[in-house]
From Swiss-Prot:
Region annotated Disordered, chain positions: 56-83
Task performed by this protein: One of the primary rRNA binding proteins, this protein initially binds near the 5'-end of the 23S rRNA. It is important during the early stages of 50S assembly. It makes multiple contacts with different domains of the 23S rRNA in the assembled 50S subunit and ribosome. Forms part of the polypeptide exit tunnel.
This protein's record includes keyword Mitochondrion: no
Pfam family, one: Ribosomal_L4
Gene giving rise to this polypeptide: rplD
Originating species: Bifidobacterium adolescentis (strain ATCC 15703 / DSM 20083 / NCTC 11814 / E194a)
InterPro entries: Ribosomal_uL4 (IPR002136), Ribosomal_uL4-like (IPR013005), Ribosomal_uL4_dom_sf (IPR023574)
Any one GO cellular component localisation term in the record: ribonucleoprotein complex
UniProt protein name: Large ribosomal subunit protein uL4
Keywords carried by this UniProt record: Ribonucleoprotein, Ribosomal protein, RNA-binding, rRNA-binding
Length: 221
């Protein structure tokens, strides 16, 4: 596979050049991406499940306060027999088979998560929806400047913006834009790519992302 060429634009949305993106991350074909949809789906579902707190809880008849004595005698009243006013059929009674605290997380191997991210990034790159933008806010944060830089590239569509942790001004500039989800390069994940129509890297964010992906490869080698 050949490296993928991504457009680089300035703070006015004008093209200033290109940058090579590694084929092993951005270069999978549409057919390969299509064949990996079950993998992508599994990783996204696992990520959403892991985000659940799982603190929901209902009270069973044994947990509800009261109901210690039998409301009336077993026989002779003409009414149905009852053992407690906290039985499920009673108003303010306990809940039957209600939700209890649980852990929703699913085991997802690192290689699966890494592979899913590569395929969704390739899908966006194949559509021309991945770009590198110079926001031009290195001296002071400016949301107005960030909007001017992003609009020509993303057409105001929902965008995941990948930033470096070192450049705080870029984060402050884009965090309040309604159509933008900012994320640091080492946190980029499958879900945040799938839910966005465009993926935009800052220059430093792109370098940081590639550096983060190169470290595991170097360890395996």
């Amino acid at each position: 596979m050949a490296n993928v060429t991504l457009n680089v634009t300035d703070n006015q949305g004008k093209a200033t050049g290109t940058v090579d993106a590694p084929a092993e991350i951005f270069g999978f074909s549409a057919e390969e991406v299509q064949s990996r949809i079950p993998l992508i789906h599994q990783v996204v579902i696992a990520q959403l499940a892991a985000a659940r707190q799982g603190t929901h809880a209902t009270k069973t008849r044994g947990m509800v306060s009261g109901g210690g004595r039998k409301p009336w005698k077993q026989k002779g009243t003409g009414r149905a027999r009852q053992g407690s006013i906290r039985a499920p059929q009673w108003y303010h009674g306990g809940t039957v088979f209600g939700p209890q605290p649980r852990d929703y997380s699913q085991r997802t191997p690192k290689k699966m998560k890494a592979a899913a991210l590569k395929y969704v990034l390739s899908d966006r790159a194949n559509a021309g929806h991945v770009a590198v933008v110079d926001f031009g806010v290195s001296e002071a944060p400016s949301t107005k400047a960030a909007v001017a830089a992003l609009t020509p590239v993303t057409e105001n569509k929902f965008t995941t913006v990948v930033l470096s942790r070192e450049n705080v001004n870029e984060w402050l500039s884009v965090r309040n834009i309604p159509t933008v989800h900012p994320i640091f390069a080492d946190q980029l994940n499958t879900y945040d790519v799938v839910t966005a129509q465009y993926v935009v890297f800052s220059k430093e964010g792109f370098d940081a992302f590639l550096a983060a992906k190169a470290e595991p490869a170097a360890k395996e080698a």
